[in-house]
Amino acid sequence: NLVRTVFGNWGVVGQPGSKGPRGAWINDNNGYIGDVSPIIGVEVSANDTSGNPLTFHSVVVTPADRPNLGGFEESPTGKFWGFEPVSGYLNETQERVAISTDPNTWPPYWPDKLNESDDSGWSGKWNGYFGKDIQNIQQESYFLMDDNNDEEFNHSQYNNLGVAFHPDSLNLSRNGLGLKMAVRGMQWQQFLAQDCIFWVYEVKNESTTDYKKAVFGMLVGTYIGVTSTEDRGEYDDDWSFFDVNDDITYTGDFDNDVSRNPKWDGDVGMVGYAFLESPGNPFDGIDNDGDYQELEGAPFAPLFEESNFDSTLINVGQIVILIDSDYLRTEYTIPDLDTVEVITGGEKILIIPGETYLSEGNPIELSNNIEGANINAFDGIDNDLDGLIDENYFLHYRQRRVDQNGTILFDIINPRAYIDYISGLGIDNPLIDEARDDNIDNDGDWDMEYDDIGADGIPDTQDIGENDGQPTHGEPNFDETDVDESDQIGLTSFDYFTPAGDYPMKHDEQLWEKLKPGFFDTPSSIQNGVPIAGEDGDFIYGSGFFPLRAGQTERFSVALVYGKDLEGLIN
């Protein structure tokens, strides 16, 4: 593999710069990144200390050593508020992250495997993505982080909202949002994979709180030409952009000249950050990833039409769909009353039969004569009582992206499939609202001949599920081991900022706005998709919204990929 990088078990790739190459390709002195790290944002409904209900946003960051606006995310006493490593996942007598090729880095046992009845803790065995001691990945690293240190909204004296939010009603000492993130880095030497590192993130909501709206993001500090911790100024002529169709963001050096770094060897090239798996939404009734026809013989499902986004008059006797807190749908017939109050998704909707019109995600005029979707397409509620949550004209029918200046980035008619909860069409299609924890082989690719090898993922060990003729968790091509069993959302936001210090690390609401779906802030140095200048700029990209319920795990994976030019990068 041609990629080398330093990283830490606090979630930052490319740091500390003094410890090794910083996202280097081909040559260890050919560094491409200053810092790359995950971000998780969540909308929280809670009460302040006076009992008044309110909604706020908490965005959990990593301790990236980088310029920012207003200082680091930390307490008044200097305690970092964000993701920090979970202990027990490396050999504490040395400093390296646990890595598959070096047993000396492994812990005495793996805390997340203590409940394995046949081999508690997997002592002396690698905790692999594909199962116990399976090392068919050339090199694999593994660590865990959680947000227990992020106490900003757990104690009212730390925030200006007067909030003392406790995410876990069963453990009031649990701080943050109750999130834990497992992180794996993966590399292969094969020709097709030699120019990338794969990063796999699993975020679990360990709290007792259901979050209706969450968003995943990545912060990318660009620095083509970096070697270690020196400051040769090579960060001031980079350019960055994105391709929503291919779910990739990328960075190049404008003049293709990094001669200020005398250690650089060879051509400059480019670096990209590609979603291989984005978070999924298995609750909205919509085929977000457009794969509803990929299973042979899959039941019919309707496609969105323009008329689906017209306002609908609600009349007496009309059947509507109500959604409970577990996302179960029930039919409800509008009674012959002057006013009718219904509850869906925990929200009250008042209806005057024969007068009330309902709509969701319909086109409206936003500021500066820019047309966009009704803001109710982003609230996690079924506002028009059709059983679909947050349908969006500009996402699920006419897929259009517009930047902050009103420039259309692309605009195509590409309707998504959905479930018609009144007629029942689409409800039996396993590739609409598929999930990696629904106990279903949604895409039908589990093969009894090859995959029926048991929960440990290893053949011929006679463990649970082996040769029982049905899929078992831990076996290949089923639920958590099958990326395709997720109704993926893809790239939904991109925020470019310059200078690189314009990163509001400690300002949760500002970060939330940058991560919101539909926010595409493109650099002025890009015209018609082509760079006209280089500068010192970094970016944040996001994928959301999706529900993150208590006990739920969402997965996403990113490839840090390199190429000589944009075509080579994408290919």
Where do the PLM segments sit?
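A long-range scaffold signal marking pre-active-site subdomains of enzyme folds
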Residues: 1-571
